[in-house]
Curated annotation (Swiss-Prot):
This is Tyrosine--tRNA ligase. The gene is tyrS. Homodimer. Catalyzes the attachment of tyrosine to tRNA(Tyr) in a two-step reaction: tyrosine is first activated by ATP to form Tyr-AMP and then transferred to the acceptor end of tRNA(Tyr). ATP binds at K229. One of its GO terms (cellular component) is cytosol.
Length: 403
């Protein structure tokens, strides 16, 4: 059994902020298993690695003997979380929310322990709440308090509309903690206002206020913007293992350490520190660290054998040796007369523009099935299939079809 100090170290790994740390320590000291809550609005059907930052932290609480509550915001999902938004988010239909919620339940147990997980829906209590009850709840905070939120303040100052239902969202999320009697609530750094709302409402309803633990927002594949499906810089946890491996191997070396801190169970803090020292000293290649992480992620969301097969496929491309047929086949539509190589690279998503493709070709940084291609006039038409590689990290197995 972990000591209090060991528990605090594991809980604090990668965390941005814990409010209040002394309250968390006191609750851990009591020896009573904590009720740890995190809410997810089912606004899209699939989860990605950015979502797993919170799920991973929930799993760590489970490993310490605590009960976690995976709260599906089927009610709040129909409101639309305004956090960080400059415009009003379009609410989802009940049918969309429920369809997405079903896929969430299937995916989360790739990480969470079923025996220590409650799956709850906040329509359980809000579906029974009367209009009078909702008005009483809304009376707990003022418009002035709501305008303390950065996103609301910016929209108000910029004379952008703020719908009344958006003001209700933090209150509704906060009341979830009351309904669930949460001891701890987890959320991203963009959720701090909403999480603190839960503390205040719990005190109002005579409960001990929950501890708030915020986690950083995971940067996506570009290493800059928050991981997001809309930006295309994400890895979905339901993606094929080969995609998980190849995408992970493309991330920048600096981002690797961030991902290890927030996504890895297998690489301890001490081991990550040793890896950093070895890389800095030239005794370890950053690629090998990245491969360790890629193997862990592919195994977690698939299995060890599938992960090894995916790694073999990735290795076959980067070395020019081995079987590349395990790589996913991407169909690219081209006109009957075909495309020149620069246009093909752009159409396949391997370069952002034809000018960048031309630059890569002149640098002899483009290979097709392991052979360097630098003929700018070379044409490819329907029926072509092969592995195209741009630089060391960017590649795809493509098949050209008539558009």
């Amino acid at each position: 059994m972990a000591t209090i100090d060991e528990s605090l170290a594991l809980i604090g790994r990668g965390a941005e902020e814990i409010l209040k740390l002394e309250q968390l320590e006191a609750r851990l000291t009591s020896g009573v298993p904590l009720r740890v809550k995190a809410g997810f609005d089912p606004t899209a059907p699939d989860l990605h690695l950015g979502h797993t930052v919170l799920l991973n932290k929930m799993r760590q609480f489970q490993e310490l003997g605590h009960q976690v509550i995976f709260l599906i915001g089927d009610f709040t999902g129909m409101i639309g979380d305004p956090s960080g938004k400059n415009v009003t988010r379009k609410p989802l239909s009940r049918e969309d929310v429920l369809a997405n919620a079903r896929t969430y339940e299937e995916q989360v147990f790739k990480i969470l322990d079923r025996t220590r997980t409650e799956v709850r829906f906040n329509s359980e209590w809000f579906g029974q709440m009367s209009a009078a009850d909702m008005i009483k709840l809304s009376a707990q905070h003022t418009v002035a308090r709501m305008l303390e939120r950065d996103d609301f303040a910016k929209r108000f100052a910029g004379q952008q509309p703020i719908a009344i239902h958006e003001f209700l969202y933090p209150l509704v999320q906060g009341y979830d903690s009351v309904a669930l009697k949460a001891d701890v609530e987890l959320g991203g750094t963009d959720q701090t206002f909403n999480l603190l709302m839960g503390r205040g409402l719990q005190e109002h309803y005579g409960q001990a206020p929950q501890v708030v633990l915020t986690m950083p927002l995971l940067e996506g594949l570009d290493g800059v913007a928050k991981m997001s499906k809309s930006l295309g810089n994400y890895i979905g946890i339901n993606e094929p293992a080969i995609d998980i491996v190849t995408k992970t191997m493309k991330i920048g070396d600096t981002l690797t350490w961030r991902w290890i801190d927030l996504l890895s169970f297998d690489i301890s803090v001490a081991e990550a520190a040793r890896f950093k020292e070895d890389v800095a000293a030239g005794n370890l290649h950053p690629r090998d660290v990245k491969l360790r992480l890629a193997r862990e992620l592919a195994t977690r969301f698939h299995d060890a054998a599938t992960a090894e097969q995916a790694i073999a496929g990735w290795h076959a491309v980067v070395t020019g040796q081995g079987d590349t047929s395990v790589l996913p086949l991407q169909q690219v539509s081209v006109p009957a007369e075909g495309l020149r190589i620069a246009s093909l690279l752009t159409a396949a998503g391997l370069t952002p523009s034809n000018s960048e493709a031309t630059r890569k070709l002149k640098e002899r940084a483009v290979k097709i099935d392991g052979e360097v291609v630098d003929d700018l006039a070379r044409q490819f038409g329907p029926g072509f299939e092969g592995v195209i590689q741009v630089g060391k990290r960017n590649f795809a197995r493509v098949a050209l079809v008539t558009s």
